[in-house]
Regions:
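Short terminal (N- or C-terminal) low-complexity/amphipathic segments
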Residues: 83, 88-107, 136, 142
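A broad, low-specificity signal marking well-ordered, structured residues that form hydrophobic/aromatic
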Residues: 29, 49, 95, 141
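OB-fold and OB-like beta-barrel modules that bind single-stranded nucleic acids
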Residues: 5-13, 31, 67-79, 97-100
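Beta-rich strand-turn-strand
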Residues: 54-90, 103-104
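Short, well-ordered turn and helix-capping elements at secondary-structure junctions
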Residues: 13-15, 33-37, 55-57, 81-83, ...
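Core FKBP-type peptidyl-prolyl cis-trans isomerase
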Residues: 4-46, 91
Length: 143
């Protein structure tokens, strides 16, 4: 049996840093991941995936990402059972991140931190860039 997850998406908010009871660093974040297919209205739906990363990598992740950062992660799905403050049994499903990669430049991340994203559109593409690839008829190709 395999429990492997690979996702690419953007952080929905700043990563949250915690310490466990065993004094281990823990970072929680939510990754917005677009689905491959479009809905009936022609829009791509987005899933919001809870993720957690532990240890030294957690601190590196928290210090090098910000809301909107484009990242890739690899890890596993984990189901945790706990009792909340009201004494109710709760379940939490999240991705435990083993590895991550930055999928945008440091300059892009820094410009997002400073709030100066005027040079690009909301998707990180230059203004006026086509949203979809251009369709080219095979008759127009020289080969």
């Amino acid at each position: 049996m395999l429990n492997n997850v690979s996702l690419t998406g953007r952080l929905t908010k700043e990563p949250e840093v915690f310490k466990t009871a065993a004094d281990l660093e823990l970072v929680r974040f939510t990754l917005a991941v677009d689905r491959v297919f479009k809905s009936k209205t022609g829009q791509r739906e987005t899933d919001f995936i809870e993720c957690v990363i532990f240890g030294k990598r957690a601190l590196i992740f928290a210090s090098s990402t910000t809301k909107g950062s484009l990242i890739g992660i690899a890890g596993r799905i984990s189901n945790n059972h706990f009792e909340n403050k009201q004494g109710e049994q709760q379940w939490r499903t999240s991705v435990v991140v083993d590895n991550f990669a930055w999928l945008e430049s440091r300059a892009m991340t820094e410009s997002r931190r400073s709030g100066s994203m005027q040079a690009t559109g909301t998707d990180g593409m230059p203004p006026g860039a086509p949203a979809e690839p251009a369709e080219i008829a095979t008759d127009d190709l020289p080969f």
